[in-house]
Amino acid sequence: LLDRPPELVIEPATLGRTRWRMTTERGDKSAADDYIEPMNKTSPRALPASIDLTVALLAEAEYLADRSLGTVLYLALKMGRPIFLEGEAGVGKTEIAKVLSSTLGRRLIRLQCYEGLDIGAAVYEWNYAAQMISIRAAEAEGEHDRARLEHDVFSERFLIKRPLLQALEPDTAGAPVLLIDEIDRTDEAFEAYLLEVLADFQITIPEMGTVKAAHPPIVVITSNRTREVHDALKRRCLYHWVGYPTAERELAIVRAKVPGVSKKLTEQVVAFVQALRKQDLFKSPGVAETLDWAAALSELDVVALDPATVSDTLGVLLKYQDDIARLEGSKVKDLLDEAKSELRAAE
C-alpha cells in the first residue's frame, strides 16, 4: 500500500495527443487507459513583452484599457500570478478574460460562481450512474474481484471534469485562461479550497492521485464586492480595481463597440451617463449599460437626446425602480441640460 495517493502527471504525448500518466512513490509509471484530445491545436501566441504591448493586445479586441490596468495585466502574465479584478458590475472585468483568451489564442474556461458552489460543480465528480452500469455489467460477466472492480470504476473514463480540473490539463495552444467569475458569491470554505489550488496548481483526487498542471493557467478572478473576499486569497493575486472610465475613454469605447451611432449622439450619451453616475443611485450604470443604451437609441433612429426619449429608455440604463423614480419630474431635463452644457464647454 502507498502512504499517499499516487500522482497523476499530465504530460504531452506524441501525435498531438495528451496522455495521463500515473507516478507512484517508487517512481513507476503506467500509462492510463484513456487519452484526451487537446481542444485547440493552433500555435499559442507569445505573451506581450511590455506594458504598451499588453495595452495594444487588449485594443486588438476593442478593449480600451488604461495604463494602470495594462501594467497589472502585464505583471500577472510575466510573473505567472492570478489577477484579482474588483469593481462594480458592468465595468468590463469579465471581458478582460475573454479578450485575453481570444487575442492569445487560448482556451477560455469559465467557472461562474454562485452561493453553494461546491467541489462537485467546480472541480470534479464521479459519474455514479455509469459506474453502477459498469459494475452490474462486470458482475453479469462473472467478475467478482472487488479490488479490480474498484480500480476500474474509479478510472478517468468515469471522471466528470469541472472547470478547475479542466484548467490543469495541457493544451497545444498553451495554458488556458481560467476565469473565476464573481468569487464574492461563494463562501469562505470555497475560497479556502481555491487558495490551496492556486498555491500549487494541483488537485488531489483521493481515488486516483494528484493532478498537477505542467503549465499553470492564466487565472482571472473577478468580484463585484458584494462582500469582502478573504485577504489570503487576494494576497495570492495581483489586485486591480476596475472603475468607471473617464468620459474620454468611455467615448472611445462606445465609438469602437457601437460604430453606427452618430458622433453627436455618442457624445450626448456619454455625457449624460457620466452625469447620471454622480447621482445617489443604488446601482449606477456601467459601461455595458452605456453600450446597450447607445445601441437602443440607434435602433430607435434617435439623432439627439431629449427629455422624453431619455425618460422612455431609462430602463436600459437603470435596473432598479427606486433609481428610476429618483429621476421623475424635471430631474431628467436637469441632467440632460448639465450634460449638454459640459459638451458645449469642452468645444
Task: Give short role names for the model-derived ranges.
Residues 10-32:
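A cross-taxon signal for low-complexity, glycine/charged-rich
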Residues 35-347:
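C-terminal regulatory/interaction module of P-loop NTP-utilizing enzymes
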Residues 1-5, 9:
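Hydrophobic, low-acid, alpha-helix-prone terminal segments
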